Each structure stands twice: as C-alpha cells, then as structure tokens.
Amino acid sequence: MKKHVLALMLLAGPAFADLETARDLMEAGDFEAAREMFLPLARSGNADAEELIGVMYAMGLGVERDDQRAFEWYLRSSLKGHPGAQSGIGWYYEIGRGMHAPDLVRAYMWYTLSAIGGDPDAAISLEEVVKKMTQAEIDKAHILVEDYKGWMYPLR
C-alpha cells in the first residue's frame, strides 16, 4: 500500500509543478505558453487545467474567444466538482451567452453547487439570479440541486 501511495505522489509532483508554471505564465500574460502547458494536463483530466482553459476561451486570452469551447472545458471541470468552473457554467446559463436564451434554473443550480464546493463568490451570484426568478423556477432549481448534489458531493 505504501508503495502505491509513494508512486502516486511521485507521478502527481510533476503535474502539479506544470500546473503552477502554467498559472505563472498565464498571470504574466504569456497565454500561448500557458495554454500549451495546460492542454496535456486538461486532456488527462486535471480539473484545474480544464477550468483555466475554459477561462482562456471565455475571455479570449491567447485564443480567439469561443463560448462553445469555454463552456465545454468548464463543464468537464464542473462535473469533477471544480467550484470555479461551476460558477463559470452558472454564468453562461445566467447570461445566456452562446445559447438561445438564459436558463436561470440551471444557473441557480450551478451557482449553488459552486457555493457548496467552496467558491465564496458563488453566493453573490446566486443572490443576483434569485432576484430574476419566480418561485416555481426556484423550486425546480432546488430539485436539480438535490439531484446533482447527491452524486457530486455524496459525503456533504
């Protein structure tokens, strides 16, 4: 058992270092280099890298802004429980950018999951969405939250 844990730690070390280096590059404005480092991590399932690639596409950082790709990367990360990506998905549903229309029920759901996951800004976004919703929409959103929460956060 100890050998397995040690092996996992050794494998995770370089990935963590690559993620931190890519974040530093992104903060320094070298978006293309950051994206090149994020992509292999994201393709291997790293939720942080997936979320940050989503940010790059959503904001057009080093790439042409592409709402569909941003949403797809955010969704991959969101389904792994990444609170920042869940807020990103919530924002897309709230605004309706790249969609036929806003979907406040789904926005509420994703902001709630993000808040449960620890994103402090999600509660603020949730308050704003509630102001735009009917009670029937809020009730429907609560059902979705309970459904997703059950499999996304089984121990909470």
For every predicted segment, state its role.
Residues 29-30, 43-47, 59-61, 66, ...:
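Short helix-capping/linker turns of helical repeat alpha-solenoids
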Residues 19-25, 40-41, 52-59, 63, ...:
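Hydrophobic face of amphipathic alpha-helices that form TPR/SEL1-like repeat modules
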Residues 2-8:
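Sec-dependent signal peptide recognition
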Residues 12-14:
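N-terminal signal peptide c-region/cleavage motif recognized by signal peptidases
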Residues 16-36:
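N-terminal leader/linker segments that initiate helical-solenoid repeat arrays
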Residues 121-156:
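Terminal, low-structured helical/coil segments at or just beyond the last alpha-helical repeat
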